[in-house]
Amino acid sequence: MRDTNIAFASGKGGTGKTTVAVNLAYFLAYSQQQVQYLDCDVEEPNGHIFLKPEMDLKTPAKLMVPVIDQKKCTFCGECSAHCQFNALVTLPKNVLLFPELCHGCGLCVRICPENAITEGEREIGYIENGRAIHGIEFIHGVLNVGEPMAGPLIQEVKRQYKKQYVRIIDAPPGTSCPVVKTIADADAVVMVTEPTPFGLHDLKIAVSVAKNLGKPIGVAINRQNGEFPPLVTYLLKNNLPVIMVLPENREIARHYSMGNILLQTLPIYIDQFMELAVNIGRLLGKTKCRW
Amino acid sequence: MTHIKEIVVVSGKGGTGKTSLTGALSSLFRDKVIADCDVDAANLHMILQPEEVLQTKEFTGGKKARIDPDRCTKCGICREVCHYDAISEDFVVDTVSCEGCGACYFLCPAKAVNFSTRLAGYCYVCSTSGNGRFVFAELLPGEENSGKLVAMVRNETRTEAEKTGSNLILIDGPPGIGCPVISSITGTHLAVVVTEPTPTGIHDLKRIVELAHHFQIKAALVINKSDINPQYVQEMKQYCEEKGLIYLGEIPYETQITEAQKEAKAILDFAPECVASRAIREIYTKLQSILEEL
């Protein structure tokens, strides 16, 4: 299973992505695999709370931003007319930049007829690297509060891929561009869902995102408390395999609320994660890798 | 029209109970318009069950580049100017990586790049039975610009509030602290943060409160599933005091809420006398008096 990307997504928030991802990482590392854990939920990264890595490197993440030389600028308005993100506004005697709207594309730098714009940088967050239990290589991105540009920071996290590792990638909730960016190069996507109408509604959207990208998908059902027939019907109809089931259980909730890795304090659930690992192996068999 | 007050329910962490709380509050407040700003994964309509869609509006997202192979001279300028490595060696644009900046389109000497908008979602204005007007949206799977669609939902909601003479807008927000959340909370009068007493709950709570304060929005706290871990409840109350947040109350872990969810019903209708329903009514009473002072 070396050199594979396994992404965890859900659509709906709070279904247990991080719990499943963290425990699978723990299980694989415990079974002597080389594991890298990448937290791409840069808005609210949580993996470190459970894996408790010792961080040894913190790097600011930067995004290109234009710097306008007001002396050279003739206020012709070419830059603001071309900017697709409305990050520049030309006034009669000034050009205003709204840095948080800027995507750092550099078009204004190239389009300015007076060469009055150069490339600068601004910080949008930071990346931290560390090492967690059983040698898990840990990376997460943390978006600055007030910063809307999650996408470039996610790309930055993904630049840290370690070759030969099993890479466990925790995606943000939702079904839009940050999720797409996170799972774009996944070899398999694990959808963590809960058996409620809300969980199912959002699962359907998330599945169609992953399907559009051509990803093999497995579904992990969390907080199962008796069968939820609409979910069963949907999964059958769409030929989606259930690759793990975790029960609704107050003990699990309690251990979660203490920030524990489940398998460390409630090892009885090891069978579920073994099954998950085997099933992911099966999903991968459909693409390029085997155990 | 400036007397319309906007309350947004947010959480940072997903799955803490935003929609359950918003759904419950919807049946308590009178004369309001409700908005679901979680456009990636909208759920509130499943509780409110709109009677009729009064208006459907199309949402066009950002543009995407596409290279016309017949005109392309393979000069490579597009690959050079693209900051997102979105153009392959054989000059095909990867729509996932393309940010829609237009650099390739404007700078291609052969004019071989098409750059056009596409349908990215829908915004619906609905009527409900007994809950007033309700606005929600659906972003098409995997699309971008969810922040812009949120802005559209909020504009439509304000228009409806003015039309119907409502003085309150109640918004169900998305999880996280990024673009769609910023778009959901800016200009509101109060952010109600729903959290849970877990290490992830408190971690994410701090970031969303910081965000609210960054935009100078008053924040109030609701602790859901409050009996899971009393130690964190204490810590959260203390945090509340330190940061000058309004403490709205706590909702105990209630299995009836899960049952209500399974039937997509608001807890107040499903089990009006359960402890959670009583707690929510108290929160509502507090909110009412806070609203008068906003």
Annotate the PLM regions:
Chain B
Residues 139-141, 145, 154-180:
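Switch II (G3) loop of P-loop NTPases
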Residues 180-199:
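Inter-motif core of Ras-like GTPase G domains
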Residues 42-61, 126:
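P-loop NTPase switch/communication element
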Residues 77-94, 103-119:
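Iron-sulfur cluster-binding cysteine motifs and their immediate structural context
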Residues 2-29:
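Walker A (P-loop) phosphate-binding motif
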Residues 32-45, 117-122:
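Short beta-strand-centered segment that lines the nucleotide-binding/catalytic pocket of NTP-utilizing
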Residues 39-41, 176, 198-200, 226-230, ...:
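Conserved nucleotide-binding/hydrolysis micro-motifs of P-loop NTPases
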Residues 1, 211-294:
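C-terminal lobe/tail of nucleotide-utilizing enzymes
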